[in-house]
Amino acid sequence: MDQVILIGHSRAGRDIFEVAERLPDLGVDGLLAVAPALISPFSGELPDVPTSILIPQYDGDVSTLDGAKIYDDLENDPERTASTELIYLKGGNHAGFSTALVRPDPFADAESIAATMPAEKQRAFFSQYTKEFLQSVLEKQQTPFADTQELPDQYADCEILMQVDVPAKDLFSAVGADAQLTTEKAAADWVNASSTVDNTAGAFRLPGGFTTYDLLRIRWDEPDAEISFPCSADLSGYTNLQIDLAQDSSDERNGQQDQQVVVMLQDARGNRAAVTLPAGTPALRWQQGEIERIPMWEGEDFLQYSTFTPLGTVRIPLEDFQDVDLSAIREIRLVFPSDAGSIMLREIQAF
């Protein structure tokens, strides 16, 4: 048997990874995990095959959206060569992918159920993406958006937010919290966006239920604040700059407004070129919600934003950075034109 792709929903969304790893003779070509439930740790290595993970915003069953944790495990495998996609489906819920589950999520609250998209619309999204996933994996051995320059914020008439991982050159990473940087009119600090008491990221809320997730939090209170990352990189053989980031919608500095970011490269001769990520870029949008206070102990509350704020991947064609020597890049700079704001930065790569 050849051309094998496994698709699993909920607990089966986790189990397909185990099947592919434990039965190598099956020759699995790709994995599509739908609202996967990470009920126990994986028993071995995760398969190095094209993988897509769908997580619905209003999942009352897998309320921590465990698929984000699986994506992170795949992304941080240094030996991995296959592409990976994480798609956050706004307005989706756990049951909406399947006709076998006709009732709303039994653990979802009334407000979430009211905001959930019609099940027919969610299944149409799932059907279209599944077809495209199968075609892309079998014909190109990659996930559908692996080499797409401008990642969409709409798919099958549904709003989405996407992270995509492909083999790439790391230029900055928040993992380990030890990268060099300088700031001007901005404050930067390393935070742990954890779902536990070890959280240091305030009310910022990632999907995934992480115990540890390193981010660089950048905050500013006046326009044209900057943060710079020194590097020594030859980018002439790459086509795109890729940034994983998110607006911290829980921070009142953002004023419930979308943000914009100017991305600047500087070469060894001091030449600079800039590209603007405009307000409305999916990863820089304000996500509607409010800060919730969860009572803990000794009078302290755990702060949590009512809406998940996933990271999004932004890609910029390197050819858009004109008049710099891409073979001798020495600095990456982010400039924030707005009067005030706050973002979370995970990584900057070239591929």
Residue map of PLM features:
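A conserved short beta-strand
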Residues: D25-L38, P50
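Gly/Ser-rich "nucleophile elbow"/oxyanion-hole loop immediately N-terminal to the catalytic nucleophile
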Residues: M1-H9
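Alpha/beta-hydrolase-fold serine-hydrolase catalytic core, especially in secreted/extracellular enzymes
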Residues: G91-H94, A100-E226, S236-Q242, Q247, ...
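Noncatalytic modules at the cell exterior or secretory-pathway interfaces
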Residues: D323-R333
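Gly/Ala-rich beta-loop-alpha elbow adjacent to hydrolase catalytic centers
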Residues: G8-A12, I16
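Extracellular ligand-binding interfaces
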Residues: R217-D323, F336-F351
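Alpha/beta-hydrolase-fold catalytic nucleophile elbow
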Residues: I7, L32-A35, L54, L89-K90
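Active-site-adjacent alpha-helix of alpha/beta-hydrolase-fold enzymes
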Residues: L46-E120
